[in-house]
Amino acid sequence: MAPGEKIKAKIKKNLPVRGPQAPTIKDLMHWYCMNTNTHGCRRIVVSRGRLRRLLWIAFTLTAVALIIWQCALLVFSFYTVSVSIKVHFQKLDFPAVTICNINPYKYSAVSDLLTDLDSETKQALLSLYGVKESRKRREAGSMPSTLEGTPPRFFKLIPLLVFNENEKGKARDFFTGRKRKISGKIIHKASNVMHVHESKKLVGFQLCSNDTSDCATYTFSSGINAIQEWYKLHYMNIMAQVPLEKKINMSYSAEELLVTCFFDGMSCDARNFTLFHHPMYGNCYTFNNKENATILSTSMGGSEYGLQVILYINEDEYNPFLVSSTGAKVLIHQQNEYPFIEDVGMEIETAMSTSIGMHLTESFKLSEPYSQCTEDGSDVPVTNIYNAAYSLQICLYSCFQTKMVEKCGCAQYSQPLPPAANYCNYQQHPNWMYCYYQLYQAFVREELGCQSVCKQSCSFKEWTLTTSLAQWPSEASEKWLLNVLTWDQSQQINKKLNKTDLAKLLIFYKDLNQRSIMESPANSIEMLLSNFGGQLGLWMSCSVVCVIEIIEVFFIDFFSIIARRQWHKAKDWWARRQTPPSTETPSSRQGQDNPALDTDDDLPTFTSAMRLPPAPGSTVPGTPPPRYNTLRLDRAFSSQLTDTQLTNEL
């Protein structure tokens, strides 16, 4: 064998064999871990320290277990041929139903409090339209019809004015007949009465502050609206001074209002209703309220399985100046919700059967940062003065009532009282009407800041209502039906009933299909991680293990090396400072003593294997050895061992 071949065979014999030709399984696994694209296996081999190796072993085994589990689920799901059928019969909670008579108090019970006000109102109607009191009222002897000898107290507090379009800036005082110059703001309010011909006269009233220097005039195209608004202001002032217990007694009891009651085909009575006193509608009664032990539910749809009541309206006890329609008001709401009957209540007619079909819709919105809604109102800086769950309407009215107490010194009569506040009245707060109207105009123009502070509730229920009417009772059944109801209510009603005194109401679910509207984030954490993983895997072939490697190298090892270098520099600086400077010149270092000599701790190559260590006790010469031609081995290993090629001869 040639000398070159012998040296080559000897070097191959001494060098370890790597790769698929490795002699042992340990060497094979070592080669695999060093050359595979699976990141975790390589980190197990190259990591220094027992703790890091254990952590990488745990990470890798966990990833392998998750892969096996997910793949097994996918395989089982693929080969499983089955279907699932779910049959669900649901019951829907029946909502709370609040019923009020449109007339808040019996006229016979409050007539003593309203005698002077009604007399002045009659005079205004007589002067404007020639309207006189009905014969029925006169025969009842309710009150005098003239104001002879009586000072016009209410006209003096809020003067009624008649405006003529031909005379700008002037108005005629309704009581004295004198013309006066109108200064300040003139606010025209729309009328809800239809006019075929446009009227050239406007009726209104003037509100002034205490010093009468600042006034506001409100005009109406219809005198009916002007007088009703004027009457309502005085009415609220009078009723605000009446104790609550007395007002409850002056209104309708549950036994008077409710003639018959059925729910889901079973009889119910006044005990199933809860009293709720409303400032503007008197005694109202709520069916299926939150104060009940259990919330009633229904398992069937249709008119036969809802709430059926017959109401006694008693038109003879209506206040002719406060309300101009006959019937009842109904509101469907949640059990913990305040019934804003004056805003969203439905009116039902007398001598009619009103059927209301419901369809439930639940809405769930996402809170911040997806929307500006609130979960329970705790993050809204407005005190809830209602004994009910938060809603946007409650927040707006609470905000306005709080501003009313701050600006005017008293609370508006139609809303609940804030803590340590009283309702407005002339005696204690003579300026409250002007203050209230000015504040309300600012509220409508969104100048109080309530609309910007209050938020919509994130979750709420609403019922889509379908209303149908039918004449009730029919002519064929009217006689016997009214006789039976009169006999049945003889203890509560001391007169023969007629159909204009009664109203029938049916409230039911059209079907039990419940619609839910739920918001969900378009981009969730899972979606974000999935998108990141897809991009990293597509462009860099990177996985979760690769991310952990990056964290280890660039956030742990990187800063550890920097800190270690700074620490060594500090130690060297401190050592040089402590050691006195030496006068001896350092000897030149050559060979292995030279710091420029690179020592490699990696696996041996042919070049490093040929670099034999010096003999013990020998010194490395400072001059290079002579060039002997017998040591030239480039021809022997020119094709195999390129590392031994020497430089060109000098």
UniProtKB/Swiss-Prot annotation:
Keyword Ion transport: yes
PTM summary: Phosphorylated on serine and threonine residues. Aldosterone and insulin increase the basal level of phosphorylation. Ubiquitinated. Can be ubiquitinated at multiple sites and undergo monoubiquitination and polyubiquitination. Ubiquitination by NEDD4 or NEDD4L inhibits the ENaC channel through endocytosis, intracellular retention and degradation of its individual subunits.
Reactions catalysed according to its record: Na(+)(in) = Na(+)(out)
Segments carrying motif PY motif: 624-628, 624-628
Positions in the Extracellular compartment: 77-542
Compartments (UniProt record): Apical cell membrane
GO cellular component annotations of the record: apical plasma membrane; cell surface; external side of plasma membrane; extracellular exosome; membrane; plasma membrane; sodium channel complex
Cystine connections: 100-284, 208-215, 261-268, 373-458, 395-454, 399-450, 408-435, 410-424
Protein name in the entry: Epithelial sodium channel subunit gamma
Higher taxonomy: Eukaryota, Metazoa, Chordata, Craniata, Vertebrata
